[in-house]
């Protein structure tokens, strides 16, 4: 995917209606049909199944959002990017008779926004925006002391995770260029729509949708400010003119974009003070991310470096306009037909997966977080064995006692993360054959994953399924093992089946 030219959407006036618990029983969000097109892009890539189904901007009641986030449960927190104000973002799910929609809810403090009318006015202005490059704002709440914003939910984490804290693979050069282009397009669209000041542009503000396409968070426009005097800007990302006068101007956004480009080049966050010094020394080789060595055109990197240096010019009048930045970055785009999720090394999420609220075990498997998966399996104990445990030869009490002791020894090793020892004890338990336990197979599968034996892990997960045919955990473990075996499509299919089974159990 990619685009050579951009045609930006003009903002539409959206109706503002308060959503209460009663409304959800019969209300389904109506899609806003808008003519956003990129002439040289695959229109499905980056847009997602839900772009045409973005609901109209609405005012939500506090009770609806509390229900959606399980009373703002700490386990629902999906973002804790630091700021000078509370900056917690929660994942939530709004349910009606016919619909389920995942949302993100940002919680502000009343002290930051003492005037609810000003909060509502700012939120409505941002809520009028609709664009494929944005994480669109779909509602707000300023009931009582609450100051809440509601946006689309992006399931594939932030640029901070993919650029700075990656596990499997570094972000390739072509994807970094795509991120730069899409963010610039989002900024230009909003500039043309009258919102010219984006605050604290950084990698935390860029999120990836179900297609793996980068989008700019709408929360960056929501600041308690007047005439450019912003009261809560993070000084780590601010331009020199703000430090001098306390005022932001449209050119300040270009400066922030320059620091953003340096992050993409280097693979690490460079504070603006260091960034300017690096630019002045013209030391591109030192700046470049060493993980990209030999995997990028040096001339293209030099052009991005030069563009960043112009964005970081001390004189705001000497900085390029966002439209000019787009023109330069567009010429550098590569792999136009390769989907973003492929370049990120993740699986594409389908509509089914986006509609269903995710469990902790789903998130752990989707993110290949073995440590979290281990904690979940340990917490499950043997609750699922009640319907499948076969106590053959119950008269052999001593044998039963012995086999239970063996299992307990395996459990102790599993709990203490002595996975090879746990494998030995669980194997003894299975070979005795007096008790049949899907949980033991699941735990041994988990141990094999930690010991880098995905084939054995897959066999045990399949055996757990044979014992307990509709147990979601068995499917989740198969998904992880298949991913470890680089069977990406099979893993995605298995993850989807696990999600369906889990949803059936919860309904």
Swiss-Prot record:
It comes from Arabidopsis thaliana (Mouse-ear cress). Its EC number is 2.7.11.1. Coiled coil: none annotated. The lineage of its organism: Eukaryota, Viridiplantae, Streptophyta, Embryophyta, Tracheophyta. Transmembrane segments: none annotated. It is an enzyme of class 2 (transferase). The keyword rRNA processing does not apply. Interacts with BRI1, ASK7/BIN2, BSK1, BSK6 and BSK8. This is Serine/threonine-protein kinase BSK11.
